[in-house]
């Protein structure tokens, strides 16, 4: 962080802010040039990154301006130090969880001679799945607290994850309408939407991020957070729709409307302010809508999805240009001359991020694309699954293909794809183990596909 003091025409006593951050006491280094140009009465071209600084008023909480800024700076460094251990620990946890889930697959369990332990492991993975899917939201909720070391966030995230995950499991495990994973997904997505409506306080110092700085945008959603929100929303909507997706057009339209609302909160400049995330969210919503239709997802629907997504993006950019005036909105609205340099920077950032975790990134991309292609191949187990459980199958296909769109249209798209996958792994595992012998009533709902016996 760099301290900055402004005085003279247009400035009063108090904290500085800009439309780049919309946070009292926080501005970007890129705000310096447009501020100077505005001070001397020169117009600010759309290709200029940053926004004009202005006075935001006194520091909140009765603090002096200096004390408030020092507290922000301290929390920034503490959060940055705590981020990697927390995120890496969770990724390792999901990796171990995934390996245990794969070991329960009939083919692998036979190879591992898992006849004795397979059913017991599947029963255990039921509640563990709910706990794992509840964890990511805690990385945002911890931002509501001030702490001085990495101990508090680890304890908070762990206790929250266990309390919410196990609480949802025991509360909804025998509910024939609302399973525990759906309950967690709906709750988590709702918390994130409500937080955006009230200014995005949880986005200031989130633990979730793909680097020491990514995520600390101070205003709007990072790509990692957007992927998490989209994953929660898709699986929550799919779980609520359930069997209603079969032959009931009204349920599909209601699901699309819910996902459209989530997409708007992601893209609108006064809320999520993530245009690349908006593109991915709209595309994912449309893929889910078409994939759950009676006709299924056909190739000819791809141009329709592209056209609708383009139209929706143009509309959100127009709304931003009229009412909010974020930098990204100005750049896109300014035409190719202003937008191309911004997209060029995004591509370079994306390539750099993929290179930093090359093997894991390429492996994840390859597996996600392979899954999407496999799900649409005829004469596979998916052919019957599309008919018996369109909500679950359509959601999985939408997340897989939508995460590829997220990868292509965001500078840190690999982070957005990653968080969508992190939400999906425990969700899919829960659906898989729901047929385990001895599982709760909810885990044996009609329409689920029991795993093969050894």
Feature roles, as predicted:
Residues 230, 254, 299-320, 324-454:
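Long, compositionally biased intrinsically disordered regions
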Residues 144-151, 266-275, 408-415:
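Membrane-interface helix caps and helix-loop-helix hairpins in membrane proteins
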Residues 258-261, 276-315, 425-426:
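Hydrophobic alpha-helical segments of polytopic membrane proteins
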């Amino acid at each position: 962080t760099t301290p900055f003091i402004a005085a003279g025409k247009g400035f009063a006593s108090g904290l500085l802010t800009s439309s780049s951050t919309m946070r009292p006491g926080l501005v970007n280094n890129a705000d310096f040039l447009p501020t100077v140009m505005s001070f001397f009465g020169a117009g600010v071209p759309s290709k200029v990154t940053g926004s004009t600084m202005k006075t935001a008023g006194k520091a909140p909480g009765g603090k002096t301006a200096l004390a408030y800024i020092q507290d922000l700076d301290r929390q920034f460094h503490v959060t940055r130090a705590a981020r990697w251990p927390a995120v890496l620990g969770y990724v390792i946890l999901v990796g171990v969880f995934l390996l245990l889930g794969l070991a329960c697959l009939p083919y692998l369990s036979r190879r591992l001679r898992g006849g004795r332990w397979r059913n017991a492991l599947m029963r255990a993975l039921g509640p563990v799945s709910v706990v794992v899917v509840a964890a990511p939201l805690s990385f945002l909720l911890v931002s509501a607290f001030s702490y001085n070391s990495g101990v508090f966030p680890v304890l908070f995230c762990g206790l929250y994850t266990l309390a919410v995950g196990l609480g949802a499991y025991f509360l909804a495990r025998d509910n024939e309408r609302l399973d525990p994973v759906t309950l967690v997904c709906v709750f988590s997505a709702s918390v994130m939407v409500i937080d955006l409506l009230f200014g995005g306080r949880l986005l200031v110092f989130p633990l979730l991020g793909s680097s020491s700085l990514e995520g600390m945008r101070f205003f709007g959603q990072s790509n990692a957070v957007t992927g998490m929100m989209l994953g929660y929303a898709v699986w929550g909507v799919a779980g609520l729709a359930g069997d209603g997706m079969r032959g009931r057009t009204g349920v599909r339209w209601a699901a699309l409307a819910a996902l459209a609302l989530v997409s708007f909160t992601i893209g609108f400049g006064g809320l999520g302010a993530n245009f690349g995330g908006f593109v991915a969210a709209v595309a994912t919503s449309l893929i889910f809508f078409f994939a759950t239709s009676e006709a299924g997802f056909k190739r000819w629907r791809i141009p329709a999805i592209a056209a609708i997504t383009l139209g929706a993006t143009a509309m959100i950019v127009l709304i931003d240009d009229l009412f909010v005036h974020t930098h990204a909105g100005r750049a896109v609205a300014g035409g190719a001359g202003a937008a191309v340099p911004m997209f060029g920077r995004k591509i370079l950032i994306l390539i750099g991020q993929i290179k930093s975790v090359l093997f894991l990134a390429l492996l994840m991309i390859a597996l996600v694309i392979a899954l999407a292609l496999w799900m649409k191949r005829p004469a596979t187990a998916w052919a019957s699954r599309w008919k018996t459980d369109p909500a679950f199958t359509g959601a999985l296909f939408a997340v897989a293909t939508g995460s590829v769109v997220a990868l292509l249209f965001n500078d840190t798209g690999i982070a957005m794809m990653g968080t969508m996958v992190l939400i999906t792994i425990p969700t899919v595992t829960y659906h898989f183990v729901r047929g385990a012998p001895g599982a709760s009533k909810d885990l044996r709902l009609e329409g689920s596909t029991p795993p093969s016996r050894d």
